[in-house]
Swiss-Prot record:
Catalytic reaction(s) noted: 2-[(2R,5Z)-2-carboxy-4-methylthiazol-5(2H)-ylidene]ethyl phosphate + 4-amino-2-methyl-5-(diphosphooxymethyl)pyrimidine + 2 H(+) = thiamine phosphate + CO2 + diphosphate; 2-(2-carboxy-4-methylthiazol-5-yl)ethyl phosphate + 4-amino-2-methyl-5-(diphosphooxymethyl)pyrimidine + 2 H(+) = thiamine phosphate + CO2 + diphosphate; 4-methyl-5-(2-phosphooxyethyl)-thiazole + 4-amino-2-methyl-5-(diphosphooxymethyl)pyrimidine + H(+) = thiamine phosphate + diphosphate
Entry's family note: Belongs to the thiamine-phosphate synthase family.
Keywords recorded for this protein, A-Z: Magnesium, Metal-binding, Thiamine biosynthesis, Transferase
Positions of 4-amino-2-methyl-5-(diphosphooxymethyl)pyrimidine binding: 43-47, 75, 114, 144
Function: Condenses 4-methyl-5-(beta-hydroxyethyl)thiazole monophosphate (THZ-P) and 2-methyl-4-amino-5-hydroxymethyl pyrimidine pyrophosphate (HMP-PP) to form thiamine monophosphate (TMP).
Pfam families: TMP-TENI
Entry cofactors: Mg(2+)
GO CC terms: cytoplasm
Protein name: Thiamine-phosphate synthase
């Protein structure tokens, strides 16, 4: 395991998931703004892309992350993560098993897991080859249609487990409800629309990051 990546993960607070913004054509500019605001990890998550277009978009994300010292995450695809030398591969509960992802990627990249219940979070915290996990969706969100909300109680249950690995709350989190997530015990968050739909992505990211850092230091 790359210890530098592990340390960067441990210090990360704000994780952004974005699509390729093909309808706006501003992916590079958007990423520069969000990363300047304090985003630590960027995951490209765009189910509309074929592999070639995803690789092209990831080149843009890679360059932006390198400019700002952020981690690049790939969703689901170990082969694509390998192709772009991603820092992070994020796997859902029904995606490629971790042992197979490690066989493709080796030890360097970080691997994350999605969970929607404290019991699954506890299992991910113990799973060999996993470096972090997410719990959610905290609130129902259009980015996960049909997925029932785990709720703040589930975030609190995970926090009470005192996981050994870094973990993030995810799902419907924004400036208006972040304080509830922090009160439940989370100290890291994954956001989508809170930044992707913001009029000022840099300012939105900066405010979220400020509150996450303050909570972690308290």
């Amino acid at each position: 395991m790359d210890e530098t990546l592990r340390k960067r993960l441990e210090s990360a607070r704000l994780y952004l998931c974005t699509d390729a913004r093909a309808d706006r054509g501003d992916l590079a500019e958007f990423l520069d703004a969000a990363l300047a605001g304090g985003v630590d990890i960027v995951q490209l998550r765009d189910k509309t892309l074929d592999a070639r277009d995803e690789l092209a978009a990831l080149e843009v994300v890679r360059e932006a992350c390198d400019r700002h010292g952020a981690l690049l995450a790939v969703n689901d695809r170990a082969d694509i993560a390998h192709a772009v030398n991603a820092d992070v591969l994020h796997l859902g509960q029904r995606d490629l098993p971790v042992r197979y992802a490690r066989a493709i990627l080796g030890d360097r990249p970080l691997i994350g897991r999605s969970t929607n219940a404290a019991e699954l979070s506890a299992a991910a915290d113990r799973e060999e080859g996993v470096d972090y996990f997410c719990i959610g969706p905290v609130w129902a969100t259009p980015t996960k249609p049909g997925r029932p909300a785990a709720g703040l109680d589930e975030v609190a249950r995970v926090a009470a487990l005192h996981p050994q690995r870094p973990w993030f709350a995810i799902g419907g989190i924004n400036e208006d409800n972040l304080d509830q997530v922090l009160a439940a015990g989370a100290r890291r968050a994954v956001v989508v629309r809170a930044i992707t739909e913001a009029e000022d992505p840099r300012a939105a990211a900066a405010e979220l990051k400020r509150r996450l850092v303050a909570a972690a230091a308290a």
